[in-house]
Curated annotation (Swiss-Prot):
Its main location: membrane. It is found in: Cell inner membrane. This is Undecaprenyl-diphosphatase. One of its GO terms (biological process) is response to antibiotic. InterPro entries: UppP. The gene is uppP. One of its GO terms (molecular function) is undecaprenyl-diphosphatase activity. Catalyzes the dephosphorylation of undecaprenyl diphosphate (UPP). Confers resistance to bacitracin.
Length: 273
């Protein structure tokens, strides 16, 4: 295994972990980072999806007590409602993803569409934060299926790379009446089924690009994603308990504009597809 490949895998794993659960788009950052590292062929695209497994497992680990309680309480009203809400929120993006993911990847999985989505998403976050929030739900356990459906519909926007799955679901939660902490935590829980499904589906569909020699690359990337995601989750929950999402909105806008300006002036030769 080439050491350069392992270094790239490690760096991309850190990018995945740090950005997956923040409202700044992990897919967008991975596309841009892969382009800069010249790691953007078919195998690289499978890799960037597969290392999401490390990030997913970090959520499972961080909230292991909650997930174990749901499993032990299976059949109780509280556990059933929690699982129902996840299923309701999962379905809209899952259905649209199966129908349109090939078209989306062909046209939008490139640096410039990502940059536009970063800026647009940042503006939407600023708009959502400036709206008056009427909090109906302080805790994830107090959600109903209507809240979940609204968040699930918002998650469909995240099929566009650069939008951010966590950003779409968190803003959807805020607009549905959830507190910032409840919206962030439900976004984390919702990541488990949607990311497991997307990861295994994508890896299976592109299994011809995978070889046993690539195992080290995937292991390094996944471990880096797990550790960095765990750090990001804990820091993010502490942050949103006392702050809004304006900082992330301005980061998105600034980063997206940098990509667009460097492309316009030819400072970086971003790929066009």
């Amino acid at each position: 295994m080439d050491w350069l490949i392992l270094i790239k895998a490690f760096l991309l794993g850190i990018v995945e972990g740090l950005t997956e659960f923040l409202p700044i788009s992990s897919t967008g950052h991975l596309i841009l980072a892969g382009d800069l590292l010249d790691f953007n062929d078919d195998k690289a695209q499978v890799f960037t999806v597969a290392i999401q497994l490390g990030a997913i497992l970090s959520v499972c680990w961080e909230y292991r007590a909650r997930l174990i309680n749901v499993a032990r309480g299976w059949g109780t009203r509280r556990a059933n409602r929690f699982v129902l809400n996840l299923c309701v929120a999962f379905l809209p993006a899952a259905i649209l993803g199966l129908l349109f993911i090939k078209t989306i990847k062909y046209y939008l999985f490139h640096p410039l569409p990502v940059a536009i989505a970063l800026v647009t998403g940042g503006v939407l976050i600023l708009w959502a934060e400036r709206r008056e929030h009427r909090i109906e739900v302080e805790n994830v356990d107090d959600m109903n299926w209507k809240h979940a459906l609204k968040i699930g519909c918002a998650q469909c926007l995240a099929l566009i790379p650069g939008t951010s799955r966590s950003g779409a679901t968190i803003i959807g939660g805020l607009l549905s009446g959830l507190s910032r902490k409840a919206a962030a935590e439900f976004s984390f829980f919702l990541a488990i089924p949607i990311m497991f499904a997307a990861t295994f589906y994508d890896v299976y569909k592109h299994r011809e690009f995978l070889h046993s020699d690539d195992l080290g690359m995937f292991v390094v990337g996944s471990i880096a994603a797990f550790i960095s995601a765990l750090i990001a989750i804990r820091g993010f929950i502490r942050y949103v308990s006392h702050h809004d999402f304006t900082l992330f909105a301005w980061y998105r806008i600034g980063f997206g504009l940098i990509v667009l300006l460097t492309a316009h002036f030819g400072l970086i030769n971003w790929s066009a597809g």
